[in-house]
Amino acid sequence: VALEPDAIPEQADLGRLETLLGGVLAENPDVSDPVYRTNVPLALLQLRKARMVSGRGGQADRLYISEALSALRRFADRERYAPEPDRLVEMAYVAGNDGTAQPYYVFLPRTYDPEREEPWPLMVFLHGYVPSISILQPWVLDVETCRIAADLGCILLIPYGRRNTDFQGVGETDVLAGIREVRELFPVDPDRIYLSGVSMGGMGTWNLALRHPGLFAAATPITGQTDMHAWWPRLLPDWPLDRDDLWPFRRMLVEWDNPIDLVRNARNQKLFVQHGENDLLIPVKQSLDMVAAAHALGIPIRVHVFPGASHYIYWDRPCFENAWGWAVQQHLDRSPAHVTYKTYSLEYDTAFWARILAFVRWGREAVLDCRVADDGVLHIDTVNVADVRIDTEPAPLPEPGPDGYAVRVNGEARSVVPSVDGSLTIAVEPGAGVVPGGDTWLPRKRKGLCGPVEEVFDGPFLVVPGTGGAGADQERVRRNAMTWIQEWDRFADGIPRIRVDSELTTAEIRAHNLVLFGGPETNSVVAAI
């Protein structure tokens, strides 16, 4: 990249910083380069902060601009940013969905050595709900609490989570992106990644662990919700007390990220939950009911209730010492003999070595139960599953016979020959419904093209206002698009990418979900559809 160190001033205003960053991005740099990844996104984040405080008075904008210039200077000098140990350090990445620079926070042990032969365990902490949270005022842990993880030998990661998202949707993608960044920039042990969180982050811990079995070696939720069917009636007086009284589509949207409905996904996961006995915000019953539901399926979950304690057990350190001290003793087992999984969307399709490839019917729960018996036969039992893939490398299967692997699918005996990569692809039952013939409707529901609408914003998307029609129509479309963009910013802390319909390219259409504003008379993309 043609950015010389002497081209970066000691001081600059917002306009000059924007010009410098624009020049870097215009050169199409290698975004996988660690020097780029540890500096340029951080400079973009500081630019965002400087814009937010510009005009408020004081020196805050100059401080953020100075930090951005320091990051650009390191980039020009080909210097990878190396966080200082024993200090909570802000880093950043560019989000794949809306293209905004987002923060995450890293705390390295005092003994951290990137050249150490043994990789480092990673502790991921999810914060609680705070109405005022922003990139200017993130919810992070104090240094002494960070040191609990560090003194246990862990790198500590605190994702931002896009404000207050329950770590679902865009918040979940932020957590996974932060984990990916840290794994690729630091020597992390993939079999010792631990997840923990408090309050809202406690529920996020349940959700991420249950949606991604096989990712975390242990999960330790603290004072988190587990059943939104019991939670919403406490807040919304018109919410039905009985889940059967919800319209089916609404019930599905509650249950697809409701921990207690995903409890079977806890099988083979190491979980330790803590709660205050007298928690008036999130009753201890939320945790105890989850533990009971797991035990009913033969799934053990460790639990500790603090006698007489309120919701805010995480204002003291014992809950962290309990959770993290226990977690670091756990290692991920990638080859359990019995795997169970429930999902409502193919965005979440994998448990350890078993993957759901297709549903029979969309909009309904799918359940997968895979078990390697003592005689080596693979038993697969399903509900609403059309196709399954088995990764035979981690699966504890014997060597295949001359006719392949012995499998029983919903009680039917089969012999399945592995594919070239060694995996097994098994057709369980055909998908239901009628698919129009010919070219009348080419797209079929598949992973990434199925909904719910939340999934539009989990992947790359563009806001596309129309530019056609009369002046008043154009102004209405523009105003509606800007209103939505501001709503997104208030929710997810970032201004998403915008492309008017007349400038949208075929390549951009292929690479993005489109959020279209206007009708056929004002938006050429809507007209084409």
Regions found by a protein language model. Give the residues of each.
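Mobile cap/lid helix-loop segments that gate and shape the active-site cleft of serine hydrolases
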Residues: 132-141, 217-264, 268-269
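Short beta-strand/loop motif that positions the catalytic acidic residue
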Residues: 266, 272-275, 279
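Gly/Ser-rich "nucleophile elbow"/oxyanion-hole loop immediately N-terminal to the catalytic nucleophile
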Residues: 110-118, 166-200, 210-216, 265
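Active-site machinery of serine-nucleophile hydrolases
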Residues: 119-185, 462
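Long, folded non-catalytic interaction modules
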Residues: 435-529
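A domain-start/cap signature at the N-terminus of enzymes
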Residues: 3-120, 451
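C-terminal catalytic histidine-bearing segment of alpha/beta-hydrolase fold enzymes
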Residues: 278-280, 284-377, 384
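Short beta-strand immediately N-terminal to the catalytic nucleophile in serine-hydrolase-like folds
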Residues: 195-197, 222, 274
